[in-house]
Curated annotation (Swiss-Prot):
Biological-process GO terms, alphabetical: DNA replication initiation; DNA replication, synthesis of primer; plasmid maintenance; replication fork processing; response to radiation
Cited function: Involved in the restart of stalled replication forks, which reloads the replicative helicase (DnaB) on sites other than the origin of replication; the PriA-PriB pathway is the major replication restart pathway. There are several restart pathways, the PriA-PriB pathway is subdivided into 2 distinct pathways. priB and priC have redundant roles in the cell. During primosome assembly it facilitates complex formation between PriA and DnaT on DNA; stabilizes PriA on DNA, presumably by preventing or inhibiting PriA DNA translocation activity.
Inducing stimuli: Induced by hydroxyurea.
Xref: CDD domains: SSB_OBF (cd04496)
InterPro entries, sorted: NA-bd_OB-fold, Primosome_PriB/ssb, Prisomal_replication_PriB
Domain notes: Displays high structural similarity to the ssDNA-binding domains of single-stranded binding protein (SSB). Unlike SSB binds ssDNA in a shallow groove on its surface where DNA contacts both monomers. The L45 loop (residues 82-89) plays a significant role in ssDNA binding. PriB's binding sites for PriA, DnaT and ssDNA overlap on the surface of PriB.
Entry protein name: Replication restart protein PriB
Quaternary state and interactors: Homodimer. Primosome assembly occurs via a 'hand-off' mechanism. PriA binds to replication forks, subsequently PriB then DnaT bind; DnaT then displaces ssDNA to generate the helicase loading substrate, which allows DnaC to load helicase DnaB onto the fork. ssDNA is displaced from the PriB-ssDNA complex by DnaT. In a PriA-PriB-replication fork structure, movement of the PriA CRR domain exposes a surface to which PriB binds and contacts ssDNA emerging from the PriA pore. Binds PriA; binding is improved in the presence of ssDNA.
Species name: Escherichia coli (strain K12)
Signal peptide, first to last residue: none
SS bonds (residue pairs): 48-80
């Protein structure tokens, strides 16, 4: 089964870094996406806020460059996480992160 998502946007919540009891580093943040997409011949506004988690040592170096306001593209897979309150939320598990040059 295919499960791939590529999403570009702006980091809107400060990254939270943790290390699991087994020593695996994790970085969590929220990515806000806004764009205009074409659907059925019409233009529509597309907007979402997607929680992102980066796990493992491979991508941790780039997470130290990510702050609120950073523009990035994230590639990975989606999965549901159950919160302590019992509600499920969709999360993007990042496998590749690219900083978008602001042009400054």
């Amino acid at each position: 089964m295919t499960n791939r998502l590529v999403l570009s946007g702006t980091v809107c919540r400060a990254p939270l870094r943790k290390v699991s009891p087994s020593g695996i580093p994790h970085c969590q943040f929220v990515l806000e996406h806004r764009s205009v997409q074409e659907e059925a011949g019409f233009h529509r506004q597309a907007w979402c806020q997607m929680p992102v988690i980066v796990s493992g040592h491979e991508n941790q170096a780039i997470t130290h460059s990510i702050t609120v306001g950073s523009r990035i593209t994230v590639q990975g897979f989606i999965s549901c996480h159950k919160a302590k309150n019992g509600l499920s939320k969709m999360v993007l598990h990042a496998e590749q992160i690219e900083l978008i040059d602001s042009g400054d």
